């Protein structure tokens, strides 16, 4: 069990977070005998501490579980441990006890676990010499536990650890008996098997019987040993990358196991034949198997006293737990940690069943088992029930959150330098190379593994087989500390007990915190967040259920079979979003996880629909580049958005993990997206496309993201609101995270490792994409995706996962945003603001990147993202300070591709709304964005004037422009812009605002900032009135409400204010707060200006809306409502379209006319957003009354039905929940507050699928975009149809202006994406 101590390190984090960061504080003395030195691990079941025995002065492992835990595993642990005392390979039992707060077991402390040691090997494999000698010891330990009437049921590398003392360092100890079961009755006879038994064990190593939920027998432990030894020698198992328990079970059942013996000694055929012939009742011939090992050793001349591989490598098993653990913390490779995680809590019944069955006479009473109770500790008096709840659920939740935050922080660090760390820790320095073979340093192979994602399956297989696989696995589990699987696994005490240096490492990486919060989340999520990895780790029924529900969701046909990750991610979702640290963590995690979305594209949506009710686990692999994104979700379906948002920044952070990313990043997602976007891709193709785009985008995103990693994380999170896409991405990322968790936790990890490696490559690509996407995709990192940015993002999420990283990001962000707004009001502000930041730079750049500007957006996006930390400050000022020439030139030049103008407009909006984004954007891009914003009023009015005007012409657009001006840096420009071109400027600002709206949070952020009150931001979300700085804001807010809020419904407002104001500014002090402060500083000065500008604009807009733009404004509002999330997209559409070909005058002249079609065109880039905006526009056009109403709503004073609708919805959107539905509903809001809701449902249903299906089509090419929407682009009827759920009109309209729309859609993409997500929901 001392081994457990190491393993417990992680476990402790996993479960410790439940009650508090730690159940026991340092220096706490248990029973006046054991003084806590430090936590070395944690899991769902509890925490493992290294303690000093004050009587013997020796260091021991102290395994603690909260008395309030539903799953009490220590009882079984104690029962089995006591029965095994005196046997070889079993930790010495020192004492146990319980009090009202916790149960504890004290045992001998052990060293590193075998999973960690294998990963520490350069090839991730053990030599035959080490494999055979370990096999002998493990076989002896299995025979020993069987001899006392128990089955271990979770035989895996992380549950075996080497001793840490000179006398025991060459002895292997069995750990973690939390899943054990008594297979004999009191008379010693074999108990009759149950017809159906829950799955127990770890997926990778589980026997076929276990997969079939049959009663496990002695032979099943030997099957696990067989798989273990093959993995030791070969480095991986064929199902390593598959997380789905059912899929792995099918593979194992059909797989010709003799194929596994190719690299094994010929004698192993006897081993295989023998275990294959056994049944539940038959006693295995242990001696026959032992002879196989011995004969193989004789043949090869292997001596019993040869040095083990890690001894040769200098990785000393003697290393103290703490020594070995630190590397694990950073690397997630600690097998023990994995084991701890794997200890995943078994469902209460199962645990109870095990404990009750095993020993009803065994009690954790201090009097019986521990040294005499010292009178000095009455408080520790043993309570009659071990289930006493020491900490109330509330404190537990707080603790979980705390752990989450800590984990996030740790992860963030990991994310930033995980690659390097991994590489360095490996000693091979395999930073970007997919090869996983060189984990030189046993402790830190994990990161490396991550990077060792190998594109070629063989390469992955080899490297992974060597142990790299385990590293990623370890990493992924570690990365997913908050993942339910981890929590669940942690529940099993035995694994926790393993003393794995890896645990400490994992802990260091923050996994412990994650696991702690994960467990909490898992509990709250009913283990929906429990990842398959957890399932692999432990066989809880919940796991199985989750596997099917969440994992299978994640596995659409054609999608990669990495379902486990999804579940893993979910735990983070479960994690409360409110905490800043947590949010950050989520931010970091989300980007990471999303990449997984690729394989889960189709799934993602499906998942989204399913997930909305259940928050995706925050991507636990935040430390991981990929998993990172999934870290912070708030429980709840919309909380997915927080998950997405939180993870995204983390992804950014994991960017450093992106050496590979960089490599993969070579292919810009735009180009890939451009085509793939237009062409509906089969999931596999999409994945391929996404990979390509991921590679390109990652390359530039990598740099950009690396710099912006943290800020991006902070800033990006807000975009998360679009939950729908995220779920898809999440599904994939979750899978990855799950994978990672599993890998981390154990060989499951290895199995996942391959998956992880592949997915890691993909994920890293995706991570890069997402980071770029988060940064840029927020503003539509990918040009092609940008085309379908908002909706494309959503579609992209399925597809984006395949080919549009930025879309994925944007989508995810949007989805996150939408979802966050709906479900996670708290998360949303952060996400919103992050989204904002990301959007402006990314949007500007990325959207322009559609085709021609891809490189520019790349640079801009990279720079933009990079500066996000460094330059979030400049937001407003940067906008103004930026070189106008640059921006104008960019605008002028970029408008060619719809993206640039739209993108810039969107970017500007983001900048204005979210200066952070602008600041974040690289000065090239950022300057452009700022200049763009500043000049946008000028140049945009002129160069993008047509676009801007059109956008503005859309009443929502114009109003948005007003808000934008008042909100962000655009304010100053906005002041003149309205003067020069009330409409044009408005259009430009509108475009910007649209971008803002797209960003949702960004827009709110600026307005929030402008308002200079987070509450105001929320107020904005709630209603236009609250935004005093944006006097026009009410109107604008109304507009935003219809667009932004209408789209997400209740979350629209939430998108902007909640994200930035509540979450972004408050939750993310470093990124959000700084952003907010900057916003406030800039926004305040600009607020007056903004107010003036907005008032002027308002007047102008009202007049214009009343006059020529009445229908358009109506449409725009409706579209805005529909777009809510994709607000930016409608505005973007008009702005970008006009920018391309229409001058301001043209835009104005065609304001009414272009407004409708353009929004649709823009919508096209974002199918959902486009469709919704289109529907809005169409609906608005047919109903001038609606337009007028819309205008009034925009004005806020007149906002009769729409205004009222918007306002009520704004607060909800802001709050969360039905944000998407409401968002969907909102779009029709101008027409009718209620119709929008139903419409949103219909539209969401149709839009989300469409957005996904059209994402590529529409995004890449206008024609495609146009095609999807057959209805006339400017036809009002289609617009209405769309609100009803027919997104085609929007799509078709977008189609013609695919480019402009794409770029503007980039901005819009976010909004649209959110909208699409809402639809998907």
Swiss-Prot record:
GO terms for molecular function: ATP binding; protein serine kinase activity; protein serine/threonine kinase activity; protein tyrosine kinase activity; tau protein binding; tau-protein kinase activity. The modification Phosphoserine is found at residues 441, 540. Keywords: ATP-binding, Coiled coil, Cytoplasm, Kinase, Nucleotide-binding, Phosphoprotein, Serine/threonine-protein kinase, Transferase. SMART domains: S_TKc. Residues 685-781 form a coiled coil. Residues 733-772 have a biased composition (Acidic residues). Changing residue 855 to S: In a metastatic melanoma sample; somatic mutation. One of its GO terms (cellular component) is neuronal cell body. ATP binds at residues 40-48, 63. Divalent metal cations. Mg(2+) or, to a lesser extent, Mn(2+), but not Ca(2+) or Zn(2+). Gene3D superfamilies: Transferase(Phosphotransferase) domain 1. Expressed in the brain, particularly in cortical and hippocampal neurons. Weakly expressed in spinal cord and testis. No expression in adipose tissue, bladder, cervix, colon, esophagus, heart, kidney, liver, lung, ovary, placenta, prostate, skeletal muscle, small intestine, spleen, testis, thymus, thyroid or trachea. One of its GO terms (biological process) is positive regulation of microglial cell activation. Serine/threonine kinase which is able to phosphorylate TAU on serine, threonine and tyrosine residues. Induces aggregation of TAU. This is Tau-tubulin kinase 1. It comes from Homo sapiens. The lineage of its organism: Eukaryota, Metazoa, Chordata, Craniata, Vertebrata.
